[in-house]
């Protein structure tokens, strides 16, 4: 049976329900799992009946996946990837996917579906291991956007492939890793920087609960990196500490120029983080404007 703890997400209610109902699986977006793991009363609840579940809805941080497996007893947790327009899952790991693949990829393409990873400019399929736009085709792809033929033609090509706008790689075994969004990619001084990579690195900081990285306009480099950071309960962070953590571990141009410590991120009602709002709010706060280009 399926148990709904509440009509809206609340981390404490979820923990209480898992213990009371002896749930074996738990589904949610990454921000929900993070809130549960870092709740002050987390250790008081018995989650030993948990075994599996699904993390999906937005990029799943590797460090969070590891914590879910180790601290929530979800040894068989999986990741699903897709979008509303693809009904929604195109790729998913399984309970028997090797551990290293299960925490770091979205698994393999689902049965009876096709995917390809292409160069967004040329449309050509990229080699294994190279980054490109993930496209998917099959019975799950929508017929189109209601009353919007132009937008439908932009999203679905003549061969029936849905262009997701997500940047991805595929390894030699067919496992897919989502690198980021094409629109989220930051071009700083001619260097392509993927916010997801910076986020994954910062999740390793022992005092960081959650982090989101975006690009903001810059007169000199075109764009600069900005990180919004939520500290773990009871922890205090400052810019100097975060920069020291980054020093010598990632390339200098990948260290965010702007750091902002917040209590929450702007989110949709379904728990997805609104990066565009973070970008807009920072531009307003810093008095930055987009540069006109040829």
Predicted region positions:
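Acidic/polar alpha-helix N-cap and adjacent early helical turns
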Residues: 280-294
């Amino acid at each position: 049976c399926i148990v709904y703890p509440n009509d809206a997400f609340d981390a404490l209610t979820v923990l209480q329900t898992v213990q009371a109902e002896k749930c074996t699986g738990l589904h949610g977006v990454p921000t929900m799992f993070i809130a549960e793991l870092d709740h002050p009363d987390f250790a008081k609840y018995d989650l030993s009946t948990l075994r599996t579940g699904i993390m999906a809805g937005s990029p799943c941080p590797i460090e969070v996946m590891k914590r879910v497996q180790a601290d929530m007893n979800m040894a068989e947790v999986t990741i699903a990837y897709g979008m509303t327009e693809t009904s929604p899952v195109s790729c998913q790991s399984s309970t028997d996917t090797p551990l290293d693949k299960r925490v770091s990829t979205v698994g393999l393409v689902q049965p009876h579906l096709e995917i390809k990873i292409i160069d967004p400019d040329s449309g050509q399929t990229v080699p294994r291991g190279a980054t490109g736009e993930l496209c998917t085709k099959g019975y799950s792809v929508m017929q189109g956007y209601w009353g919007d033929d132009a937008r439908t033609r932009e999203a679905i090509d003549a061969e029936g492939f849905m262009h997701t706008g997500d940047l991805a790689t595929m390894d030699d075994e067919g496992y897919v890793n989502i690198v980021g969004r094409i629109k989220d990619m930051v071009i700083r001084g001619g260097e392509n920087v993927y916010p997801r990579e910076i986020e994954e690195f910062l999740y390793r900081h022992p005092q960081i609960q959650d982090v989101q990285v975006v690009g903001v306009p810059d007169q000199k480099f075109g764009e600069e990196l900005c990180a919004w950071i939520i500290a773990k309960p009871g922890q205090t962070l400052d810019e100097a500490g975060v920069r020291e953590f980054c020093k010598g571990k990632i390339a200098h141009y990948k260290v965010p120029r702007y750091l902002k410590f917040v209590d929450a991120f702007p989110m949709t009602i379904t728990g997805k983080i609104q990066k565009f709002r973070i970008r807009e709010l920072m531009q307003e706060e810093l008095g930055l404007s987009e540069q006109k280009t040829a």
